[in-house]
Amino acid sequence: MVVVTGQSKGSGDPDEAMSSSDAEDDFQEPATPTATQAGQALPLLPQQFPEVVPLNVGGMHFTTRLSTLRRYEDTMLAAMFSGRHYIPTDAEGRYFIDRDGTYFGDILNFLRSGDLPPRERVRPVYKEAQYYSIGPLLDHLEDVQPLKGEKVRQAFLGLMPYYKDHLERIIEIAKLRAVQRKARFAKLKVCVFKEEMPITPYECPHFNSLRFERSESEAKLFEHHCEVDVSFGPWEAVADVYDLLHCIVTDLSDRGITVDHQCIGVCDKHLINHYYCKRPIYEFKITWW
């Protein structure tokens, strides 16, 4: 009897036949990558932290308890050191946070014992508290100066139409004029008025009735734009013109802009009958260097 060993049906070339060793190779389970193979792959297991945690925040070193970092559950620090996220360490084994650490000590002091920073550091610490999402610290800081006063100031400015736009316009005009004239400073005329129209008639107070009783056509006669670069107003609040001027100067100064201002008169445009526009006009001097 002759036993014939042939190729699989449909196979035309002996070289195409698959050996048993080839089949085993094809169905092998993928190997678990080693640390070398994984390169920079992060650990899959939850990260374990010691009870006392050494920190490197932007190059500044701190040490605190793990419970301090986890004091408030809904904060970035609590999430970072919950074990759910991988925190890299520096060469000395300190857990690294890529953030300027100048005010991190104030953050830790609040987490430890509820201490608030001195007044001169309230603003920058508030910014750090926003970054780390520490709600209780934000609430406390908003109730102390200068942030409490700033909250009131912003409530007033919220009544001011186009305040930020007008502020930007002052800067742009001053910059353009200084560049065009190759000058160190630039001057602008700014009108600041609280009421929609100055209603005191020029040297004729008995005409005050026009303030309340005037037709639509008469009202249009009262509508005009003073010949100035920027106008602020009107608004409805107790704060007066000088309060708004203080806001303008403060906000420009906070942006590093040197500004001086003085009242140079009033708009004297004739409106109707004995009425003249008496909006105050201020000269703003912006010094660039």
Curated annotation (Swiss-Prot):
A GO CC term assigned to this protein in UniProt: cytosol
Keyword Cytoplasm attached: yes
UniProt region (Disordered), positions on chain: 1-35
SMART domains per record: BTB
Polar residues: compositionally biased ranges: 1-10
InterPro entries found in the cross-reference section: BTB/POZ_dom, SKP1/BTB/POZ_sf, T1-type_BTB
CDD domains xrefs: BTB_POZ_KCTD7
Entries under SUPFAM superfamilies matching the protein: POZ domain (SSF54695)
Protein name, as recorded: BTB/POZ domain-containing protein KCTD7
Organism of provenance: Gallus gallus (Chicken)
Gene name, Swiss-Prot/TrEMBL: KCTD7
